[in-house]
Amino acid sequence: MKIALLPNLTRSHALSVTDDVCKYLEKYNAEYYFETETAEKIGHKIKAVGLPEAELLSLCDVVIAIGGDGSLIHAARKAVKYKKPILGVNAGNLAFMAGIEKNELELLKELIEGNYTIDKRMMLDVTVKNGSCEKTLDCCLNDVVIARGEQIKLVKLNVECDGQQINDYYADGIIISTPTGSTAYSLAALL
């Protein structure tokens, strides 16, 4: 099995968790690769083979995001373009979407042996139009926030889904969410 590792190196424990993940993958004879830039940053501490993003994601069978929920969301935008499944490994204290905690790395054996199921999540493709100006955003796993920016008055928002008009809103902004994002938004409010 070929695995793309996408660690969030801004997280304090990400490098040590990445090192531990690599050791388990080696133990179970899995090949793992990093993005070129990441491999250059960590190559002095971890055996790291780097590939350009497109080659990495085309080559791999699965993507492992190491960090928190934000790391997984960021990695999901990359993985979806190549139709690759993604697994989150929590490198911090709290991650709702991580499939594995840092003290459960032995479960990587199940991944490598093919003993897993894939939970398909809805993602949003968003295009923002303002007059003749149009901007398509990356896919998003959680939600998209459209805000009025620095304007003082309310903005008119016309919301469509697959070309079908949903509604017009006059508001400061709007949050459009997937089921994953709405759950995260609700849980975050409790913390």
Q: Residue spans of the language-model regions?
A:
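A residue-level signal for conserved active-site and pocket-lining positions in enzyme catalytic cores
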Residues: 8, 64, 68, 90, ...
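A glycine- and small-aliphatic-rich helix-loop capping segment at beta-alpha/alpha-beta transitions
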Residues: 79-84, 102-106, 189-191
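Catalytic core of DAGKc-family lipid kinases
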Residues: 93-172
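Class I SAM-dependent methyltransferase SAM-binding "motif I" and its flanking Rossmann-like core
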Residues: 115-117, 121-122, 174-177, 182-191
